[in-house]
Amino acid sequence: MLDPALLRQHPADLAERLRSTRGFDLNTAELESLESERKRIQVRTQELQSLRNSKSKAIGQAKAKGEDVAALMAEVAGFGDELKASEDALDVIRAQLEGIALGIPNLPAANVPAGKDESENVEQARWGTPRQFDFAVKDHVELGAPHGWLDGETAAKLSGARFTVLRGPIARLHRALAQFMLDLHVGEHGYEETNVPLLVNADSMRGTGQLPKFEDDLFQTEVGDSKRYLIPTSEVPLTNIVRDAIVDAERLPLRMTAHSMCFRAEAGSGGRDTRGMIRQHQFEKVELVTACSPEDSEAEHQRMTRCAEVVLEKLGLPYRKVLLCTGDMGFSAIKTYDLEVWLPSQATYREISSCSNCGDFQARRMQARWRNPASGKPELLHTLNGSGTAVGRAMIAVMENYQNADGSIDVPDALRPYMGGLERIG
């Protein structure tokens, strides 16, 4: 959530910044009308509260003198009814203003390139050289399906489209990748391993920005009066650990990692990536989340992105690093780097990690704060999140980049300890 002062004091300037950087149309007329009404009702509410307090004091004094207080009591009762109505009206207006605020995306950092979509993202670096094959390259489905290692048909029978059953050595490869990533981030990068719930409440989804705007992309469960959401990423529970908390400065930065299932309805994906495991309703990811002081967030962003890069480098997977333009960034981010891994079957780079600095946007929604030793007062944290990395897409990249002419797959050196020393699949 943006600073409410921006909405109240500079709505026109804010609207122009949102339009030019995010393509977001802020209804300033509605906003200004509601804000004017809020001020009017708030002033009247405060007047009534003051009158009630003064009359209540007068009643106490009159009673002490033994005077008749019936008239005063009737007057206060009248104030009470009007005050209750005024307070209720104020709550309604505040809820409307909050609803508007919750639907406004974050403002990009000054050093984010302007652009309308992914075609205007800016490549920052490349690592590794894509392998030149002397045989016809197969995609991950052609490599895995004939052996029954990737089974979309059975998954469709069980659950429908965009699910996959993994078996045998490919299931083991998938597990090995997740374990490798966790061990790397915990052992070498200093993140605390965390096991989080896969079902969260609406407050958690609002805190990180999935609600209210992206409800159609979430899977929900309802049991009786209890409604919960399946997490689209463990960013949600990890980041919400600091919700409604004041963190001591000595504990910062908080660096957390989790390996979890993720669930996405993919409501806006249409017919994209319907083949294989590129875009699934259920997938696994190793997530990185950091909560830190504002002055450290840019350095933590660079550090987090580097941690994700190391995963790909240790696996020997060529990739490129891209700085997203204003029109391609996520709702909550002020700045985002994507890492895109080389897929030989597509002869292109595909996203495998997205690392975002959200500034104080999520922290304001969550009331996540730290105690600044310089002032002694609670101040908003900065939060960051990144994929370290998507496990299924890493598996696809390993299968395709390490394939042989006979359809077998070499196991990267970094994964062999997790595969019982196995050097080749197939």
Curated annotation (Swiss-Prot):
Record-listed E.C. numbers: 6.1.1.11
InterPro entries cross-referenced by the UniProt entry: aa-tRNA-synt_IIb (IPR002314), aa-tRNA-synth_II (IPR006195), aa-tRNA-synth_II/BPL/LPL (IPR045864), Ser-tRNA-ligase_type_1 (IPR002317), Ser-tRNA-synth_1_N (IPR015866), SerRS_1_N_sf (IPR042103), SerRS_core (IPR033729), tRNA-bd_arm (IPR010978)
Gene3D superfamilies reported in the protein's UniProt record: Bira Bifunctional Protein, Domain 2, Serine-tRNA synthetase, tRNA binding domain
Binding positions (ATP): R264, A265, E266, E351, I352, S353, S354
Subcellular location: Cytoplasm
HAMAP family: Ser_tRNA_synth_type1
Comment field on protein domains: Consists of two distinct domains, a catalytic core and a N-terminal extension that is involved in tRNA binding.
Family: Belongs to the class-II aminoacyl-tRNA synthetase family. Type-1 seryl-tRNA synthetase subfamily.
Pfam families hit by this protein: Seryl_tRNA_N, tRNA-synt_2b
Sorted UniProt keywords: Aminoacyl-tRNA synthetase, ATP-binding, Cytoplasm, Ligase, Nucleotide-binding, Protein biosynthesis
Protein name: Serine--tRNA ligase
Top EC class of this enzyme: ligase
Subunit record text: Homodimer. The tRNA molecule binds across the dimer.
Metabolic or biological pathway: Aminoacyl-tRNA biosynthesis; selenocysteinyl-tRNA(Sec) biosynthesis; L-seryl-tRNA(Sec) from L-serine and tRNA(Sec): step 1/1
Function: Catalyzes the attachment of serine to tRNA(Ser). Is also able to aminoacylate tRNA(Sec) with serine, to form the misacylated tRNA L-seryl-tRNA(Sec), which will be further converted into selenocysteinyl-tRNA(Sec).
Gene that specifies this protein: serS
GO biological process: selenocysteine biosynthetic process; seryl-tRNA aminoacylation
Catalytic activities: tRNA(Ser) + L-serine + ATP = L-seryl-tRNA(Ser) + AMP + diphosphate + H(+); tRNA(Sec) + L-serine + ATP = L-seryl-tRNA(Sec) + AMP + diphosphate + H(+)
Sites where the protein binds L-serine: T233, S234, E235, E287, S387
GO cellular component, one term: cytoplasm
Domain of life: Bacteria
Single GO MF descriptor: ATP binding
